[in-house]
């Protein structure tokens, strides 16, 4: 996570080393021909951010670099036929950004990208636990709560999970039982932001799609 902030590179040198490692794992460290590599970026990155991704990938040993917007890659990965003349909506919730796009005829018709995604959900859960239970938890614990109990629906059947953390008053280790209803409350603001982004894209989509 220290390599990327809001879906773009924040540490060029370490990112380059990471990509070089992946190239080595994929095609070996002693390749004779530089590989062609496709890299996904958020749909609303700037030209400067896009060039940084391309430069880091080439510095890591790539011959050709193809930059693909994340919604297009997500659609292809989901098996959607993006070449059809009808619209397909993709909501790609990543770590740093959520991309919402309507795709048709092989390209993005309308899209938006917001800096609310997995990391923001984790941060919201950490804040909720501090405010409502006076307990400090780490990012990994917050992510586990998100994955196991996280929900965007208020009427989801309730489930519970016991988590460990540090008591903010005594400073001692403690554990507490957390419910899915609490996670709904903790995540609701982030969910609302994503829903608003979806509505925005729908409003901008041409009626014929």
Please state what every model-predicted region is.
Residues 96:
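Conserved Rossmann-like nucleotide-cofactor binding loop
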């Amino acid at each position: 996570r220290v390599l990327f902030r809001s879906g773009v590179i924040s540490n060029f040198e370490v990112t380059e080393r990471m990509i070089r490692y992946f190239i080595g794992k994929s095609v070996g460290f002693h390749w004779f021909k530089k590989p062609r590599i496709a890299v996904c970026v958020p749909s609303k990155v700037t030209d400067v951010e896009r060039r940084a991704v391309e430069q880091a990938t080439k510095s890591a040993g790539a011959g050709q670099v193809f930059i693909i917007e994340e919604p297009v890659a997500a659609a292809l990965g989901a098996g959607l036929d993006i070449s059809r003349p009808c619209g397909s909506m993709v909501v790609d919730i990543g770590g740093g950004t959520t991309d919402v796009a309507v795709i048709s005829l092989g390209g993005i018709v309308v899209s938006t990208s917001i800096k609310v995604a997995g990391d923001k959900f984790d941060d919201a859960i950490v804040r909720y636990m501090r405010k409502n239970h006076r307990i400090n938890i780490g990012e990994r614990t917050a992510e586990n709560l998100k994955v196991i109990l996280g929900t965007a629906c208020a009427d989801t059947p309730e489930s519970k999970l016991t988590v460990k953390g540090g008591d903010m008053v005594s400073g001692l280790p403690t554990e507490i039982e957390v419910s899915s209803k609490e996670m709904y409350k903790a995540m609701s603001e982030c969910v609302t932001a994503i829903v608003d982004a979806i509505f925005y894209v729908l409003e901008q989509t041409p009626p014929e799609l």
